[in-house]
From Swiss-Prot:
Top-level taxonomic group: Bacteria
InterPro entries from the UniProt entry: Ribosome_recyc_fac (IPR002661), Ribosome_recyc_fac_dom (IPR023584), RRF_sf (IPR036191)
Biological function: Responsible for the release of ribosomes from messenger RNA at the termination of protein biosynthesis. May increase the efficiency of translation by recycling ribosomes from one round of translation to another.
GO biological process: cytoplasmic translational termination
Protein name, UniProt field: Ribosome-recycling factor
Ion transport listed as a keyword: no
Species of provenance: Buchnera aphidicola subsp. Acyrthosiphon pisum (strain APS)
Compartments where found: Cytoplasm
């Protein structure tokens, strides 16, 4: 029973870390990266299709992305989707390809982005703590229902706390890495 709680807790914390990582990966750092466009979808044959399924996204240089579109008829749709994505990118049509210059970040914009990612990190830490609280509540219920002993409860809560500390450290590491990446350019 306690093992199930530990497994579920670890899965939920891992999902939280993954969500945080995915969210801050999409924050542009002034450097060209195909992941910048991973959340771009276009309307293709009546369904929303990820951009990476209908094109190749290539890094031309550190400040330029090039999109090789498989179907020329959707080039303008892709351009429109990028413009509407709130990524502050200005795609330029060049034949059947789309060129996306990545603007350099200003110092002010870097500071804004750092505030945003720190806020995301704090939200993720709160989620981790809430997961810990839920797991501890389940353990306490098991004790109350006399399914486990007090020793087992303390051991389980210690494991959950160690797990919590581990995942909060992971959040801090991801945050620190992204902050360094933002300040580098």
């Amino acid at each position: 029973m306690i093992n199930q709680i530990d497994i579920k807790t670890r899965e939920r914390m891992e999902a939280c870390i993954q969500t945080f990582h995915n969210n801050i990966t999409n924050i542009k750092t002034g450097r060209a990266s195909p992941t910048l466009l991973h959340n771009i979808y276009i309307e293709y044959f009546g369904s929303k299709t990820p951009l990476r399924q209908v094109s190749n996204i290539i890094v031309e240089d550190s400040h330029t992305l090039k999109i090789n579109v498989f179907d020329d008829s959707i080039t303008s749709l892709i351009r429109k989707s990028i413009l509407n994505s709130n990524l502050d990118l200005n795609p330029v049509l060049q034949g059947k390809d789309i060129i996306i210059p990545i603007p350099r970040l200003t110092e002010e914009r870097r500071k804004q982005l750092i505030k945003v990612i720190r806020g995301d990190a704090e939200s993720s830490r709160i989620q981790i703590r809430n997961i810990r609280r839920d797991a501890n509540d389940k353990v306490k219920r098991l004790l109350k229902d006399k399914i486990i002993s007090e020793d087992n409860e303390h051991t389980s809560q210690s494991k959950i706390q160690i797990m919590t500390n581990e995942y909060i450290k992971k959040i801090d590491c991801i945050l620190e890495k992204k902050e360094k990446e933002l300040m580098k350019f």
